Amino acid sequence: MWFLLFAASAVVLPPFLYLVKTSLTVPRPGQGTEIGLDNYARVAEIAGWDLWVVTVAFAIGASLLAVLLGASTACLVARTNVPFRQVVFVGAFLSLATPVIVKGIGWILLLGPNNGLVNNLLREWFGIDGTPIELFSLGGMIFIEGLLFTPIAFLLTLPALSAMDPALEEAAAMAGARWPRALLRVTLPLARPSLLAVLLLSLIRALESFEVPLLIGIPGGVQTVTTALYQTVHSGFIPRYGEASAYAVLLVIAVALPLSWYYRVTREAAKFATVTGKGFRPARIDLGPWKYPCALWVLTIPVSLAAPLLIMLWASFLPFYSGPSPEDFARMTLANYRAVWARDDILAGITNSLLVGTGSACAVAAAGLMMGWTVARRREFMRWAIDVVASLPLVFPGIVLGIAILVQFLDLRFIPIYGTVWILIFAFVVQFMPYGMRFCHSGVLSINRDLEDGAYMSGARYFTVLRRIVLPLASPAVVATWIYVFMHAIRDLSVAILLSGPGNGIVSIVILDLWNNGEVPQLAALSVLVAVGAAVLGIAFMKLTATHRLYG
């Protein structure tokens, strides 16, 4: 299995080594370059502590909001008889599939200061002057990021809450505790490791967030580390790759701290086990008269997906967008949908997305199966080494991975993939390798090893066993991996934005360009089509993971 370890190392390690090298490389006019900490000093001088304070405040606020909404919804769905449970579950999965940039722009159309639907209604109904809801602010960023991560927090918390023995809550009820007290004093404390783990993952996600700070933070003059990194490359006549790499290295360190704490928390989760060998009958707490008020709370997840998509759908039928009004019904047209299929830049973005999504999904599924099989079956050093190498990209935010691969292939000019779809495929293979390995590892664990041993005893070689035994039996995990990678590769912005050029832009880049150019109706039409396609993939992924329990 040495070839597998070598191949994984050759793909994963060089981008990060080049990133560190670039951050320490200081150009001297007329003297070439030398090694030093000048880039870090320059970053500290420009940004100071304010940038990090804003970034941390944004991350903490968004993660707390996401866990509050997601965990409380999961608690109600898993432990009570609240209505619309299936609607919430489906809405959470579809929200995962919908591109962040689509939802982010949708929320701007809803809550924007000038033509936002909600602000316009508040001004009209209550006679408010100015801007009732200031979206382009740190508070607006926290609100939108928290809403965007709520479905993930819900899905991650739900399994732990669903598996709890209801006898503990029944004992609390017999002691006179009403259902709110039982949930707060019994259920949630037992789920503490899961809640803390989800909080840490939410914190990591918010630290890495790029789309929300780009769309909402920059117009409001609020900058985080990710947008500072982006502007270091894209502002000015000469990209400052050294300073951008310094930002990236510091962000990796910031992400690594909560990630290491997350692994520690999950290792200690056995202390809070409530599922034992003793059988129990799942039971739900009767909410009584609070049943339907609680239903409004759990509908936060499907509504947070439907609201931005509905305003996008509305805008897609208008010749120009200036805020919804009754007069819009007379102006509705399908011209924007026809224009989507007539524009060369949009068609090129769709084609590139399909190529990048297919290429990266096939590569990750194949590599993930081999690595997952090796980690599941091998022992000692090889298992540990492949697991560590394949998991390294988890530490690197998307924007960091983008700058790392950018500086790598700017230096390796003899590999001419910069500015092509191949550099995007390479980037997404690196980014999603940990997820592919873990999905396929779960699938391989369900296969009895005797089947493989029998094939080896019959004279079959490694690749024969992989092709004839492991692949057919682990095919649900492989297909789920393929769908997951394809679905995320075509929607990603943070990795692609630094690696895309005139010839290799994908759909997310096209949507951002349309937004920057003020072409809202055509942007909305494209976003609706992308959301429909993402929904189909999301439903397929949900069916596979639910049927074969690949996410649990």
List each model region and its residues.
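Glycine-rich helix-loop "coupling/hinge" segments at transmembrane-helix boundaries
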Residues: 112, 211-238, 324-330, 493-520
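Short helix-adjacent coil turns
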Residues: 47, 238-240, 344, 518-519
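Polytopic alpha-helical membrane proteins, predominantly small-molecule transporters/carriers
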Residues: 33, 52, 176-177
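Feature of multi-pass inner-membrane transport and sensor proteins
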Residues: 181, 218-226, 257-292, 323-324, ...
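Membrane-water interface segments at the C-terminal ends of transmembrane alpha-helices
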Residues: 1-28, 43-162, 190-211, 215-217, ...
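Short cytosolic juxtamembrane segments of multi-pass membrane proteins
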Residues: 168, 270-282, 451, 460, ...
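Short, membrane-interfacial amphipathic segments enriched in basic
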Residues: 28-37, 325-330, 334
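Short helix-to-coil transition segments within interhelical loops
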Residues: 80, 164-165, 170-191, 378, ...
